[in-house]
Amino acid sequence: MSVADNDSFEYAGACGGYLDRYGYPFCRGRVFDTVEKDKGQYDEAAEVLWTTGACMMIRSKDYWAVNGLDGRFFAHNEEIDMCWRLRMMGRKLYCLPQSKVFHVGGGTLPKGNPMKTYLNFRNNLTMLYKNLPQKELHYVMRVRWLLDYVAAWQTLILNRNVGDFCAIYRARRDFMRWRTEFRPERKEHQRERVEARVPRTLRTNFCLVWQYYARRRKTFAELP
């Protein structure tokens, strides 16, 4: 829950997180920038793909079995990356709405800071590279190449935000430069995974960008 508005879910993880086909995170209670009020609509416990790092309970042995949070990420997407690795080794994650935590969003980097944009794009691409099944990797990365540049130019032309425009370009450039550093880990993850792919209930088959911007589906309940 948000400290600023106690009746609203918090952006970072709301009531449990999922991914779309192309790696865009969304939550019960938050889709992109649309954050819902808590009206009891998500009061049931649910299996999720990821939980926010702001409020997560995990067995120590499981944390260290996947080498914990990846410190190279610094911030943003690092908990999603770890949760995905946990899922590949056969663990399941649940959101339990009976517990309630109030979180101050943007404490590390405030919204509007180009570094926040940079880390979100770079780390999200890195997370995909580390964890996607081999048969999906090249297709998803090609689509993301297109979507990322559409996002960059939309930011520049419609929002006149030069800082975020440059941040997205730098994020893609730096991802291409440092992805080889993660190649050994990727091979290890693929070799040791006990689940061939994440269920479509947790990593969906739809494109969240299309659903949100073209179909105007702004809340979790409205998604396919």
Regions found by a protein language model. Give the residues of each.
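Short, flexible, basic/aromatic active-site loop/helix in glycosyltransferases
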Residues: 17-48
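Short helix-loop capping/hinge motifs at secondary-structure junctions, enriched
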Residues: 36, 62-65, 134
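Active-site-adjacent helix/loop segment of glycosyltransferases
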Residues: 89-196
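A short, conserved alpha-helix in the catalytic core of glycosyltransferases
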Residues: 43-100
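Long, low-complexity C-terminal extensions of enzymes
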Residues: 183-224
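Conserved donor NDP-sugar-binding/catalytic core segment of glycosyltransferases
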Residues: 1-25
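Short glycine/serine/threonine-enriched helix-capping/active-site loop
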Residues: 1-2, 28, 96, 104
